[in-house]
Amino acid sequence: MTRIRPVLATMAALAVTAGITVLPALTPAASASASVPNCGGTSLARGFFSGLPMRVPTVANGHPAQWGCNLPPGSSGAAVARLQIDLNACYNAGLQVDGSYGPLTEGAVKKVQRSEHVTVDGEYGPQTASHGFQYSLSGSGQGGGCDYITTP
């Protein structure tokens, strides 16, 4: 009988270890946007086809490697204004460039997402940015054409 206790203790320890290993897999995954920082500025990136510089929303000003950021509805600032310029220049959105991500900006982003066959959630984020979103090659969005971003 004394041999059974060590065996039971070992089995219990293995069960606990297995439970600890399995439990994280059973917990709900965090949303993709929760792990991605919000856009807070703009930076220069290169156009995929043209090789020309273009301004894109990024985590902070001057950080082109951090272009994979989120701009959810309700955001405001330079990154939103940049998004509105691009939506107007490349998708004829007709938005007022006011730096406020309201219902009209959200609707314009949804329209682009539908046309590019990505998840339609109205939020500009890494998926929208890297799957067909075009950016204006002109600083003001007036002329100059549009291009896709070159991944940094």
What role is predicted for each listed range?
Residues 20-30, 54-56, 127-135:
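Short, intrinsically disordered, charge-biased short linear motifs at domain edges
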Residues 1-33:
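Secretory targeting and sorting signals
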Residues 70-81, 88-132:
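Short acidic, glycine/serine/threonine-rich helix-capping segments at coil-helix boundaries
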Residues 2-4, 30-99, 143-152:
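Acidic, Ser/Thr/Pro/Gly-enriched interdomain connector segments
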Residues 123-152:
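Short, Lys/Arg-rich amphipathic alpha-helical interaction segments
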Residues 25-29, 64, 104-108, 130, ...:
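Short, surface-exposed, charged/polar-biased interaction segments
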Residues 12-15, 40, 55, 92, ...:
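Exposed boundary/loop context
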